[in-house]
């Protein structure tokens, strides 16, 4: 019997790729939600998307054998919530948030391989003294603690770059506020509690070979 594999935001291109992998004939790949609504970067309606996903899954008459995704926020954070709800294997929400929250992920990386992690620090972009509180020299990156597709990431080469970047961050950082509702669902470590989507992280430049989790 074929397994029913729900894929959040599945499009035709990726469906063709999935159908070419080994043992694909043993799976029914089922589209869960429209990809264009999920990647609408003007507004991440996470709670609405979860409600629609639950509605579609509840109406399905067959077995739900797997729920996966292949894109960034909000899909990446929807997967663990839906997997837990429907009792299928998947990552925990905490493990995903550790990777998605840029400051938390840097703390985890620093604990595991401190010799390879450059300096970093969180800061409030609405603090007029933020630049003076960053404890390392130029150049460095600043970015929201939650972003996707490299949005709102700025390379700060000198003092004059900082105000320009901060102005844009202050205007647009609210885009990722839905991320805070996910942080409220778990017990955050003391070092991370309070560092929500309104915060940024500054970090020194890192160089080297870059590989994805998939090996690319």
Please place each PLM-identified region on the residue numbering.
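Conserved beta-strand scaffold positions in the cores of enzyme catalytic domains, especially
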Residues: 29-31, 120, 153
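ATP-binding N-terminal substructure of ATP-dependent carboxylate-amine bond-forming enzymes
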Residues: 1-95, 126-129
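Alpha-helix boundary/capping residues
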Residues: 22, 112, 137, 168-172
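Phosphate-binding site of ATP-dependent enzymes
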Residues: 160, 166-216
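Generic detector of well-ordered alpha-helical packing
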Residues: 73, 144, 213-215
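Short beta-strand segments
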Residues: 8, 143, 203
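Glycine-rich beta-alpha junction loops
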Residues: 11-12, 146-148, 206-209
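N-terminal beta-alpha lobe that positions the nucleotide/phosphoryl donor
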Residues: 42-44, 49-61, 76, 80, ...
């Amino acid at each position: 019997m074929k397994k029913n594999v729900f894929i959040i935001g599945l499009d035709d291109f990726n469906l063709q790729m999935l159908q070419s992998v080994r043992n694909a004939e043993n799976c029914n790949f089922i589209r869960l939600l429209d990809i264009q609504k999920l990647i609408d970067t003007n507004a991440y309606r996470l709670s609405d998307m979860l409600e629609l996903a639950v509605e579609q899954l509840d109406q399905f008459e067959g077995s739900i054998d797997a729920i996966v995704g292949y894109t960034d926020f909000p899909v990446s954070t929807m997967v663990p919530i839906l997997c837990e709800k429907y009792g299928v294997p998947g990552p925990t929400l905490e493990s995903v948030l550790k990777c998605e929250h840029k400051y938390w992920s840097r703390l985890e990386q620093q604990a595991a391989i401190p010799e390879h992690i450059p300096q970093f620090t969180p800061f409030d972009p609405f603090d007029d003294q933020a630049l003076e509180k960053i404890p390392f020299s130029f150049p460095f990156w600043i970015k929201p603690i939650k972003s996707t597709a490299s949005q709102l990431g700025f390379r700060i080469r000198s003092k004059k770059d900082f105000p320009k970047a901060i102005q844009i961050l202050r205007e647009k950082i609210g885009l990722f506020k839905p991320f805070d509702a996910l942080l409220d669902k778990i017990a955050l470590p003391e070092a991370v509690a309070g560092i929500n989507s309104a915060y940024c992280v500054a970090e020194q430049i890192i160089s080297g070979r870059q590989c994805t989790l998939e090996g690319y």
